[in-house]
């Protein structure tokens, strides 16, 4: 095979590692029952031994670098719809009562009981996938989820305790907070001299767990460039557990948080040791010995359909309208309630993309700070690589940024940022890695001119081609055909055998419908949308006021609530193990609750 093209460049899927260091203990083999020790037995006459199946849990994967990404390719026994059902049936719901004179909700149950408060957070990409599947609007998809999780005709209609979720929040709320803090992080990084806890320039987004997994395991030199901010999922978990535990006087372990996401890799993110109450809670005996995850369980959009099917419920048959006031419980704090359940719309436009709009928000903030400036867009060698330059009124570049989606493009970005090779020969000049990378890419002469990577101020990086609406956990065409069997009969002219396998055209059309539903969230919203640049600064100011209020309310610094850290994951696969305690060390790593991917 030519050195210019390798098999890894043909697609974006990175399979699990060949060698898995998961230690599987087995009993010694049974001794032969034959009376004659010299008897020869043919292999086809030997009865196969029924060995117990090896089970690999999520925490085992966190301590191993044998696999670089694609958590959906690993058989995971935890964080599934089964865990949701088992938890709902295992713990009774903690009684809550609304007290109007005290501006919030009170806990009327026992703080020491085994009861739980069930809360959930839902990403907008999940609602878009449901909307495209059932032919409804994004807002109706929100009503569908609320009715299923909180309403009397949903989960509360069955189960051992008739449990449901008390609050279901939109991760867009915490996404807005992350956007505001991202703009601050980029600003401070540009003004910084390179010291302190700020990431190095260019700052790379850190909301995609598949990308973080890849960086921690294969390219540790990238880690100083990663944004220190939590993802909207993680920040939602920190917010819910910190506020509710303080306001209701319960332990964070009594608050069970479910996240519904478009991506399987979000399950790995939720299992990180850095994303537990140890990072933000006050030091106590419980938090030191038993860390409590900010997100207890993550299920995908497809698993949401499986969850409903397991309870014998049909999502499209649920009322597509808002829950009555009798089914809604006010949040314990009125100020936080008005922000958390705001009716205003979020910025989900074609320009911002389908992955949260981190890059777009940074550009809009800097454009608002520089009146008369304009954003110039330059497409890269494919649709998933886009460069942006903020030009002043005098046509001077003020800020350069880029968007890289998909692992093929991420690998090109990593090559650009890789440090130069240091020659061991005295007097030799360092050899830049980018030069060899460019020699492997002869097609660049026909592509749009690309930046060097180091001149970017910010890069939005996502593992999935096309962004988060194309996440691995989204509803596939096959799932949509099963959920709505008559939806494609009128338009499909293929035979049943041919129609069973979606064509690339059908897959692109499906993704286009999901994207359309995602972008239509603003038109479905009950609030008004302001597009003036000054509104961006005004909105960021309100978000900073909210973050300050949250931090002061629970008496925890914002640096402990909104920021996290990353670490290099070293692999023992293929290394010579001379020390006698290597196996014990691997067992210890595999038994950890987290600490890297």
UniProtKB/Swiss-Prot annotation:
GO biological process: iron-sulfur cluster assembly
Keywords: 4Fe-4S, Iron, Iron-sulfur, Metal-binding
MF-aspect GO terms: 4 iron, 4 sulfur cluster binding; iron-sulfur cluster binding; metal ion binding
Residues that coordinate or bind [4Fe-4S] cluster 1: 20, 61, 64, 67
Binding site for [4Fe-4S] cluster 2: 208, 263, 464, 468
Ranges where the record places region Disordered: 25-46, 422-448
Biased composition (Polar residues): 432-444
InterPro entries listed in its UniProt record: Cytosolic_Fe-S_CAF, Fe_hydrogenase, Fe_hydrogenase_lsu_C
Family, per entry: Belongs to the NARF family.
Function recorded in the entry: Component of the cytosolic Fe/S protein assembly machinery. Required for maturation of extramitochondrial Fe/S proteins. May play a role in the transfer of pre-assembled Fe/S clusters to target apoproteins.
Protein name: Cytosolic Fe-S cluster assembly factor NAR1
Gene behind this protein: NAR1
């Amino acid at each position: 095979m030519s050195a210019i093209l390798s098999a890894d460049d043909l697609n974006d899927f990175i399979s699990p590692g060949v060698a898995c260091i998961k230690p599987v203990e087995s009993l010694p083999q049974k001794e032969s029952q034959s009376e004659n020790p010299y008897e020869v037995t043919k292999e086809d006459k030997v009865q196969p031994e029924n060995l117990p199946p090896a089970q690999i849990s999520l925490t085992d994967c966190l301590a191993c670098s044998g696999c670089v990404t694609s958590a959906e390719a690993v058989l995971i026994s935890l964080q599934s719809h089964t865990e949701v059902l088992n938890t709902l049936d295992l713990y009774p719901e903690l009684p809550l009562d609304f007290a109007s004179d005290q501006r919030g909700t009170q806990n009327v149950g026992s703080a020491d009981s085994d009861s739980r408060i069930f809360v959930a957070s839902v990403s907008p990409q999940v609602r878009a996938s449901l909307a495209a599947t059932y032919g409804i609007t994004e807002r109706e998809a929100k009503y569908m989820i609320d009715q299923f999780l909180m309403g009397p005709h949903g989960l509360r209609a069955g189960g051992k305790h008739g449990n449901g979720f008390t609050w279901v929040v939109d991760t867009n709320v915490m996404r807005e907070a992350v956007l505001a803090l991202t703009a601050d992080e980029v600003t401070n990084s540009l003004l910084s001299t390179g010291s302190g806890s700020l990431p190095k320039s260019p700052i790379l987004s850190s909301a995609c767990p598949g990308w973080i997994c890849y960086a921690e395991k294969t390219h540790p030199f990238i880690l100083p460039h990663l944004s220190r901010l939590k993802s909207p999922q993680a920040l939602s978990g920190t917010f819910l557990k910190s506020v509710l535990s303080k306001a209701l006087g319960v332990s964070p372990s009594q608050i069970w948080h479910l996240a519904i996401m478009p991506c399987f890799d979000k399950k790995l993110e939720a299992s990180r040791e850095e994303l537990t109450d140890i990072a933000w809670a006050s030091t106590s005996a419980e938090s030191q010995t038993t860390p409590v995850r900010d997100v207890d369980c993550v299920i995908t959009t497809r698993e949401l359909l499986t969850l409903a099917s397991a309870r014998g419920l049909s999502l499209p048959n649920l009322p597509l309208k808002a829950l009555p006031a009798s089914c809604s419980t006010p949040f314990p704090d009125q100020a936080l309630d008005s922000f958390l359940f705001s009716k205003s719309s979020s910025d989900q436009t074609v320009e911002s993309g389908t992955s949260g709009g981190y890059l777009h928000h940074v550009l809009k903030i800097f454009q608002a700070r520089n009146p008369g400036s304009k954003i110039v867009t330059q497409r890269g060698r494919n649709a998933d690589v886009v460069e942006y330059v903020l030009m002043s009124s005098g046509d001077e570049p003020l800020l350069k940024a880029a968007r890289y989606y998909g692992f093929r493009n991420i690998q090109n970005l990593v090559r650009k940022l890789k440090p130069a090779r240091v020659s061991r020969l005295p007097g030799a000049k360092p050899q830049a890695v980018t030069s060899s990378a460019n020699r492997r890419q002869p097609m660049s002469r026909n592509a749009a001119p690309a930046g060097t990577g180091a001149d970017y101020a910010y890069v939005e990086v996502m593992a999935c081609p096309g962004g988060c609406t194309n996440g691995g956990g989204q509803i596939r065409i096959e799932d949509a055909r099963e959920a709505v069997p008559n939806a494609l009969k009128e338009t499909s002219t293929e035979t049943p055998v041919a129609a069973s396998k979606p064509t690339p055209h059908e897959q692109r059309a499906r993704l286009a419908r999901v994207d359309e539903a995602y972008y239509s969230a603003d038109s479905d919203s009950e609030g008004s949308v302001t597009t003036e640049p000054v509104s961006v600064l005004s909105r960021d100011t309100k978000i900073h006021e909210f973050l300050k209020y949250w931090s002061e309310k629970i008496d925890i610094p914002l640096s402990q609530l909104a920021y996290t850290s990353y670490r290099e994951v070293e692999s023992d696969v293929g290394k010579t193990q001379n020390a006698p305690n290597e196996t014990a060390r691997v067992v210890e790593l595999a038994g950890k609750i987290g600490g890297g991917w």
